[in-house]
């Protein structure tokens, strides 16, 4: 019994030591911070159909060398879920890249609860999520420090969008709760006050798209860039997270997964509603070659560049927020004679 306890303590200390070695997230000397988003990996441990997903993850990380990796849900798709989760996340840990995970609706269907999987994720080196604190799967906000390390320069909100509706007369997927909306409002207000009354530039990451994705995609005047091959499978009920973010004024864009045949981005009332790129193999429906979304933030500016990276280093749909999604005033264009 003593040997088991000692081994457990050593493993725990080793994990804590690795966690302690992760430097604070910070803009580099060029004022840039790069994020890679992987989504809907649907990894099945030991299934050859998932090999291409792991290969693509490795290729993207080696090519982009990001400052942070965000896995936006449906990471694992078969038991053993804990082993599968560790395998996928090892591609970040082996490269010593900080990472976080937001759960999808399928992650806890493989024999492990959200709480159990959260603890597995937290035990991995270079994971920077907070402790659960008794909550099954907490929401959290990551701060990006300025390039000189002296102040908070940007925020990343990471939310659990849950799984399925718990109301018998409401079908489909679950929604962000009022408690989550209130939590976001409180966090945003606190950072705004700390920043002299100015909202910090922010992004949000979660799995299931908000209902506003369908509103924006159906607007004939909206500029939609990327691929849209299916309607957003959003919750039937709208609890106001988009409105809260619009009112707070910090979130520039939100990034989701869930719908494998979408990778588009569209502006809606000043906020970019974007999908990641399906990263998985042929273990679930898909009609897009797998890849990842990359986001490059700029310090001190409400702008970012984003693109999709695919097999063999191919880059598509490179856009700049907000400029790529806004129509210019044609009356002010310089005279063109040819």
Predicted regions and their residues:
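Active-site-proximal beta-strand elements of phosphoester/diester hydrolases
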Residues: 32-45, 153-162, 205, 272-278
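Binuclear metal-dependent phosphoesterase catalytic core
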Residues: 38, 143-145, 150, 241-248, ...
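Active-site environment of divalent metal-dependent phosphoester hydrolases
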Residues: 44-46, 77-82, 101-112, 164-167, ...
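His/acidic metal-ligating clusters that form di-metal
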Residues: 65-67, 155-157, 170-263, 329-334
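Positively charged n-region of N-terminal signal peptides that target proteins for export
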Residues: 1-4
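N-terminal active-site segment of His-dependent metallophosphoesterases
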Residues: 20-87
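Bacterial N-terminal signal peptides
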Residues: 7-16
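Extended active-site neighborhood of metal-dependent phosphoesterases/phosphodiesterases
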Residues: 86-196, 293-298
